[in-house]
């Protein structure tokens, strides 16, 4: 019997899933609920190639089809539809089993709201000396669950001991699965579901699951999982803010001077709890201290003062807010902020940025064209250009300009 299925949401990987099911002999309709194929040349080309290959076995809809004619409906967990459906995480898990057998025993999967990318990067860094690992997180592209299929299809899977994935819509079938946090519970699927239920319902896909004790307390959770590990992030005691050093139970961990930001403590606890099943604690301590992040943030010392520089043509308001928060938590001091207009196509919203800056109690020194515009909304000093040798205190420099 040939199943007739509907897969919804091109933006989150419907075409990738469609290709897998078509190759398995299914007939597939795709509902492009957000009209992405009309807006994206990449999606359009991908659909056209699939259509040429599979012909009438694949059809595309931009309006809601009749759900009753389908044997299965597959969609992201947050999809706003009034019909029972299989979440993408479960569909991907089933295909993995069908194509690759027990590959889930090699998979480490991290989801949540914040900290996913850092946690997966840390896990990879801790394990990669002892094991052959493959990392895919948001630094490398889409983290929608169907992307995992695309990644594994491109690899010789026998070469790797572990695959480490960051996902956005819950956990796929995996050996180790972590939900770093759910910072707020809000309605999804057009108000039909909530984010909390969606995230934690995917815990069933993890053989060993890891969740944040703060979430249990915040939402009064009662989770039934035979191998549930509760990460008590509040057991971590910060010993030094920079270089970041902390005590967790009876172990002391330290990061290098290239890392700053107190959020690294919470992220590292999930990496520690997962990796202690695979390497000894001494190895984890050593690897943590050698961890670095490839980004445009530079930290250095000038005349016994700490200078944190973030010079980036694409800096947005959210990234600026996080950078200031991290800096003030660790160092305090002056904030140099500004730069130039016309660096990238998408200009920064100066008024919106000023509203974010008003939340922080600190001294601003505005720089360049953007800085001059900010003076219309905020009090602060002003300089036309910035000279790092003239800083008077620990300083954070956030400039939206070309990287030299």
Swiss-Prot record:
One of its GO terms (biological process) is methanogenesis. ATP binds at residues 112-117. The keyword Ligase applies. It catalyses: 15,17(3)-seco-F430-17(3)-acid + ATP = coenzyme F430 + ADP + phosphate. Keywords: ATP-binding, Ligase, Methanogenesis, Nucleotide-binding. Its EC number is 6.4.1.9. The keyword Flavoprotein does not apply. Involved in the biosynthesis of the unique nickel-containing tetrapyrrole coenzyme F430, the prosthetic group of methyl-coenzyme M reductase (MCR), which plays a key role in methanogenesis and anaerobic methane oxidation. Catalyzes the activation the g-propionate side chain of 15,17(3)-seco-F430-17(3)-acid (seco-F430) for intramolecular C-C bond formation to yield the carbocyclic F ring of coenzyme F430. This is Coenzyme F(430) synthetase. It comes from Methanocaldococcus jannaschii (strain ATCC 43067 / DSM 2661 / JAL-1 / JCM 10045 / NBRC 100440) (Methanococcus jannaschii). The gene is cfbE.
């Amino acid at each position: 019997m040939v199943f007739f299925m509907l897969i919804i949401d091109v933006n989150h990987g419907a075409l990738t899933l469609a290709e897998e099911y078509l190759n398995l002999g299914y007939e597939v309709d795709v509902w492009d609920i957000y009209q992405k194929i009309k807006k994206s040349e990449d999606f359009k080309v991908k659909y056209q190639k699939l259509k040429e290959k599979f012909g009438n076995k694949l059809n595309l809809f931009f309006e809601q089809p009749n759900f009753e004619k389908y044997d299965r409906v597959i969609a992201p967990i947050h999809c706003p539809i009034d019909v029972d459906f299989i979440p993408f995480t479960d569909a991907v898990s089933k295909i993995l089993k069908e194509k690759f057998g027990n590959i889930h025993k090699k998979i480490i999967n991290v989801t949540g709201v914040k900290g996913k990318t850092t946690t997966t990067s840390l896990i990879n860094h801790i394990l990669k000396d002892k094991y052959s690992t493959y990392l895919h997180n948001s630094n490398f592209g889409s983290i929608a669950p169907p992307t995992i299929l695309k990644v594994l299809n491109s690899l010789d899977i026998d070469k790797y001991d572990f695959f480490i994935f960051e996902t956005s819509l819950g956990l796929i079938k995996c050996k180790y699965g972590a939900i770093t946090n759910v910072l707020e519970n809000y309605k999804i699927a057009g108000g039909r579901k909530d984010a909390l239920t969606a995230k934690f319902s995917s815990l069933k896909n993890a053989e060993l699951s890891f969740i944040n004790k703060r979430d249990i307390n915040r939402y009064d959770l009662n989770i039934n999982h035979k191998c549930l590990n509760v990460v008590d992030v509040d057991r971590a005691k910060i010993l030094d803010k920079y270089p970041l050093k902390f005590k967790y139970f009876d172990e002391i961990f330290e990061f290098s001077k290239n890392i700053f930001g107190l959020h690294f403590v919470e992220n590292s606890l999930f990496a520690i709890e997962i990796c202690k099943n695979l390497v000894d604690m001494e190895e984890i301590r050593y690897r943590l201290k050698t961890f670095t992040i490839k980004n445009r943030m530079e930290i250095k010392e000038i005349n016994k003062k700490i200078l944190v520089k973030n010079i980036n043509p694409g800096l947005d308001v959210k990234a600026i807010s996080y950078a200031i928060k991290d800096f003030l938590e660790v160092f305090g001091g002056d904030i140099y902020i500004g730069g130039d207009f016309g660096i990238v196509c998408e200009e920064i919203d100066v008024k919106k940025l000023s509203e974010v800056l008003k939340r922080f109690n600190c001294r601003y020194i505005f720089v360049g064209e953007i800085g001059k515009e900010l003076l219309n909304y905020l009090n602060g000093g002003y300089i036309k250009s910035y000279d790092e040798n003239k800083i008077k205190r620990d300083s954070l420099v956030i400039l939206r300009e070309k990287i030299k």
